[in-house]
């Protein structure tokens, strides 16, 4: 009888966790004129089949004490519909049979996935609560083409990989299973058996929409319906987002935030603030400081806090450190209501090699390159995404789309682009593989980045999504259109400007005359790309010192130099980015497990720097001359670029209607009276900004709020004014 109801070979394969097709033996099957039901339920004591109204249809006999049951059930000739009544040692369960359901995913959708369609990733993969034939449950689907068996495990089956082996959908390599009777909130992972027979450590879902909070590592079934039905209130914001060339003409002043440490809750074991708590505190702060955007360091779930988020393992899930995923949607909605844009750092270059993650996901190099000369990053000991693989490229593009669609983010900043573009990045001779032409350019990454930008700027994404590249080399055309051979980004971080100017300011003022070109060189290439000027977290960590600590001199000189630098930066062509804590001149470096030193704001000097940044932001946003032509040479002209003996710089900013702002910077502690400056218009000029104002912590030296441009030629202009230049300060002048 056992041989008739349940083949011994099937039993052995199922119990060993290596059956190639569990649906071929489990669930209902016709045998002559009977319906035979087979079930694998390790630990069960008794199993019966019931009709939907509770009538008994038959008993499933135990055909193997390890948990195999089989029996015939009464039927009316149609498709059998039954429930399994299971007696466990300490519980009773009535459930639909997962193996009574047919295939789940449409063949056409799977074909689109194999062809590299990111929409198919979003449509097919992950854990999705669904209803099938009036039965609620969760559809699981995961890509693992080299595995010989995949099971979904969780609290619902005691994490036993024998209980829910999945169906392989050839040729896509996607495994699927509908588990009835469970829903949102369930914890789960996948158990995979590699081609060589190894049972791998349980893997988190690469496409999970939600996760457990670290250090726990399970994926969580998200309430997809609730996410889709989220009551957004930002239609006006979304429709008004600047499109195409307009996005380059508006002010961008970005406050970069490490959300895990911006504020913590000391009375609750010093935990991180939730998204709702951040909405209450961070949004008003950003708004009050005059920033236009907040940019979060990576928030996709990451296991190691010390990575600051730059080693994510759940590309689709906001970190559970900050509460449920809906909390992030609420944060973005409230930010938009306050007129604040939200950017997120996004990491497509590499991923950590944690056992529960993507590395060797199905026992093979699935997401990474197989050759360590391509697949391992020597600096970070991480795995490099194989973006040349169709499905991997689609997976990453789908992730970017998900952030734009599900959470209405206004843009992504793509991390470590240089490491993607060069095959020999941070590698010695013999440690890298040339491209098909023998060169060092990573052609697959170039194609991926172009595709990413075309997708986010196309009809698939909400209009107005912005992409920013952290690219530290001179790769040409990072912000050029893909149609013209460029990578298609909207903006690129100007790392060269940042390194040069900080190196200049690190010099003692008496020596700055010998390094004058560091401050002017950035204008040689300032309009070759569309730039963001980044004073980011990278510059205030790992022994580099905080911004103010980089400056020489006593405390007053350091603070004054930083204020002058901020005045120079906010007047310089390019959008602005400032890392948290720098806006009030924090003395210590960034520490991911400690908040910024907010107590410094008890000191007037630090409150003054904070007040200056606020006023710079407000003036920058209010004055089109300072932002409308940030990306065009017509918006900038040197007035004084060669006064290296006095370490003085002066330049004019203008918009295309003729509005003017002139910035004058004195980077020595020597006040300079009677300094003649050529000006592009005659008459009365008022001081729009003076970083040496007493309210900012300065000496209040200056020009009593105004100067007069008379008909005395200077610096190539027909008019000029005699100025008093405060020590270590920047002035902004505008025609009255």
Curated annotation (Swiss-Prot):
GO cellular component, one term: cytosol
Keywords, ordered alphabetically: Carbohydrate metabolism, Glycogen biosynthesis, Glycogen metabolism, Glycosyltransferase, Transferase
Pathway this chain belongs to: Glycan biosynthesis; glycogen biosynthesis
Gene Ontology MF term list: 1,4-alpha-glucan branching enzyme activity; cation binding; hydrolase activity, hydrolyzing O-glycosyl compounds
Signal peptide as annotated in the record: none
Catalytic activity: Transfers a segment of a (1->4)-alpha-D-glucan chain to a primary hydroxy group in a similar glucan chain
UniProt-listed Enzyme Commission number(s): 2.4.1.18
Pfam families to which the protein is assigned, alphabetical: Alpha-amylase_C (PF02806), CBM_48 (PF02922), GlgB_N (PF22019)
Biological process (GO), any one: glycogen biosynthetic process
Catalytic center residues: 415, 470
Entry similarity comment: Belongs to the glycosyl hydrolase 13 family. GlgB subfamily.
Cross-referenced NCBIfam families: branching_enzym, PRK05402.1, PRK12313.1
Function: Catalyzes the formation of the alpha-1,6-glucosidic linkages in glycogen by scission of a 1,4-alpha-linked oligosaccharide from growing alpha-1,4-glucan chains and the subsequent attachment of the oligosaccharide to the alpha-1,6 position.
PANTHER family from the UniProt entry: 1,4-ALPHA-GLUCAN-BRANCHING ENZYME (PTHR43651:SF3)
Record note on quaternary structure: Monomer.
Protein name: 1,4-alpha-glucan branching enzyme GlgB
């Amino acid at each position: 009888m056992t041989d008739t109801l349940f083949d011994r070979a099937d039993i052995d394969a199922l119990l060993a966790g290596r059956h190639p097709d569990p649906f071929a033996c489990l669930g209902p099957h016709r045998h002559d004129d009977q319906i035979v039901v087979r079930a694998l339920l390790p630990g069960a004591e008794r199993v019966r089949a019931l009709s939907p109204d509770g009538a008994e249809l038959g008993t499933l006999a135990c055909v193997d004490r390890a948990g195999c049951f089989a029996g015939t059930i009464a039927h009316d000739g149609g498709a059998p519909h039954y429930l399994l009544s299971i007696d466990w040692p300490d519980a009773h369960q009535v459930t639909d049979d997962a193996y009574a359901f047919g295939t789940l995913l449409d063949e056409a959708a799977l074909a689109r996935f194999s062809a590299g369609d990111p929409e198919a990733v979003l449509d097919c993969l992950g854990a999705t609560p669904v209803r099938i034939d009036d039965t609620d449950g969760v559809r699981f689907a995961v890509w693992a083409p080299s595995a010989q068996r995949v099971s979904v495990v969780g609290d619902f089956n005691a994490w036993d990989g024998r209980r829910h082996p999945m169906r392989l959908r050839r040729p896509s390599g996607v495994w699927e299973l509908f588990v009835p009777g469970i829903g949102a909130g369930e914890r789960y992972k996948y158990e995979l058996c590699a081609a060589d027979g190894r049972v791998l450590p349980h893997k988190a879902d690469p496409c999970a929409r939600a996760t457990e909070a670290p250090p726990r590592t399970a994926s969580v079934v998200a309430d997809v319906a609730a996410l889709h039905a989220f009551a957004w209130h930002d239609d006006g914001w979304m429709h008004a987002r600047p499109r195409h060339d307009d996005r380059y003409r508006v002010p961008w002043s970005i406050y970069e935030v490490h959300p895990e440490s911006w504020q913590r809750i000391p009375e609750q074991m010093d935990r991180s603030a939730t998204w709702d708590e951040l909405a209450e505190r961070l949004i008003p702060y950003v708004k009050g400081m005059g920033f236009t955007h907040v940019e979060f360091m990576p928030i996709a779930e990451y296991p190691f806090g010390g990575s600051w988020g730059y080693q994510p393992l759940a590309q689709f899930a906001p970190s559970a450190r900050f509460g449920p995923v809906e909390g992030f949607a609420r944060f973005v909605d409230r930010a938009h209501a306050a007129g604040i844009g939200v950017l997120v750092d996004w990491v497509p270059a590499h991923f950590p090699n944690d056992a529960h993650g993507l590395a060797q996901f199905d026992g093979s190099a699935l997401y990474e390159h197989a050759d360590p000369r391509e697949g391992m990053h020597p600096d970070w000991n991480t795995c490099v995404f194989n973006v040349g693989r169709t499905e991997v490229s689609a997976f990453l593009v789908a992730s970017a789309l998900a952030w734009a669609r599900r959470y209405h983010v206004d843009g992504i900043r793509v991390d470590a682009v240089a490491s993607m573009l060069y095959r020999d990045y941070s590698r010695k001779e013999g440690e890298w593989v040339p491209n098909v032409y023998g060169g060092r350019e990573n052609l697959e990454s170039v194609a991926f980045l172009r595709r990413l930008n075309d997708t986010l700027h196309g009809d698939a994404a909400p209009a107005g999504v912005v992409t920013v590249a952290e690219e530290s080399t001179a790769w040409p055309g990072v912000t050029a259109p893909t149609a013209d051979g460029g990578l298609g980004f909207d903006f690129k971080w100007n790392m060269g400007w940042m390194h040069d100017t900080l190196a200049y300011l690190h010099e003692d003022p008496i020596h700055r005359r010998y390094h004058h070109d560091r401050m002017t060189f950035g204008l040689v290439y300032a309009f070759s790309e569309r730039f963001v000027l980044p004073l980011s977290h990278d510059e205030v960590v790992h022994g580099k010192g905080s911004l103010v600590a980089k400056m020489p001199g006593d405390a007053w000189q350091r603070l004054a130099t930083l204020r002058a630098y901020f005045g120079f930066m906010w007047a310089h062509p390019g959008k602005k980015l400032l890392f948290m804590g720098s806006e009030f001149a924090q003395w210590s470096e960034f520490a991911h497990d400690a908040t910024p030193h907010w107590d410094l704001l008890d000191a007037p000097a630090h409150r003054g720097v904070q007040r200056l940044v606020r006023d710079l932001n407000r003036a920058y946003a209010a004055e089109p001359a300072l932002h409308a032509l940030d990306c065009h040479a017509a918006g900038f002209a040197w007035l004084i670029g060669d006064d290296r003996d006095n370490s003085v710089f002066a330049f004019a900013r203008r918009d295309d209607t003729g509005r003017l702002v002139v910035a004058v910077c004195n980077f020595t502690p020597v006040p300079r009276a009677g300094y003649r400056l050529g000006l592009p218009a005659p008459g009365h000029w008022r001081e729009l900004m003076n970083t040496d104002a007493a309210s900012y912590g300065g000496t209040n030296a200056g020009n009593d709020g105004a100067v007069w441009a008379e008909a005395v030629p200077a610096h190539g202009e027909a008019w000029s004014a005699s100025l008093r230049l405060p020590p270590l300060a920047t002035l902004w002048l505008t025609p009255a």
